[in-house]
Amino acid sequence: MAKTANKINIRKVKRKTPKAIIHVQASFNNTIVTVTDVQGQVISSCSAGACGFKGAKKNTPFAAQTAAENAIRLLIDQGLKQAEVMISGPGRGRDTALRAIRNSGITLSLVRDVTPLPHNGCRRPKTRRV
């Protein structure tokens, strides 16, 4: 007879966070929006793939807008007032995600582009010949 495993229910504690940091990572294939508190603890996150977009539709601006709105929706109800936005990556959803965050009613204190740029580091991949 197999033993049943003891299930432990872990509930996330709802904390009021008046200030948060929103990280937008826009790659060529997907857009990931992560909301952290000032210490760096993840509060909420969403991606275009988690919103139901598959394949080539994940890198569209509309998918980035939907991911940003879903990541922020719960935090507005918890009382988020002010946020900083860190955007990284060359994807198509950068501007649309920022526009969705700005239209959500949160006061943006800082918008920073933190895309890593090489100082002539690794060799780039060869160009595609289609």
From Swiss-Prot:
Question: Which InterPro entries did the record assign?
Answer: Ribosomal_uS11 (IPR001971), Ribosomal_uS11_bac-type (IPR019981), Ribosomal_uS11_CS (IPR018102), Ribosomal_uS11_sf (IPR036967)
PROSITE patterns in alphabetical order: RIBOSOMAL_S11 (PS00054)
**UniProt-listed PANTHER family:** 40S RIBOSOMAL PROTEIN S14/30S RIBOSOMAL PROTEIN S11 (PTHR11759)
Species lineage: Eukaryota, Viridiplantae, Streptophyta, Zygnematophyceae, Zygnematophycidae
Which superkingdom does the taxonomy of this entry point to?
Answer: Eukaryota
Q: What SUPFAM superfamilies does this protein map onto?
A: Translational machinery components (SSF53137)
Q: Which gene encodes it?
A: rps11
User: One Pfam family from the UniProt entry?
Assistant: Ribosomal_S11
| Compartment(s) of residence | Plastid, Chloroplast
Quaternary structure and partners: Part of the 30S ribosomal subunit.
Q: What is this protein called?
A: Small ribosomal subunit protein uS11c
Coarse class of the primary localization is plastid
Gene Ontology terms: biological process? translation
Give GO cellular component annotations, separated by semicolons: chloroplast; ribonucleoprotein complex; ribosome
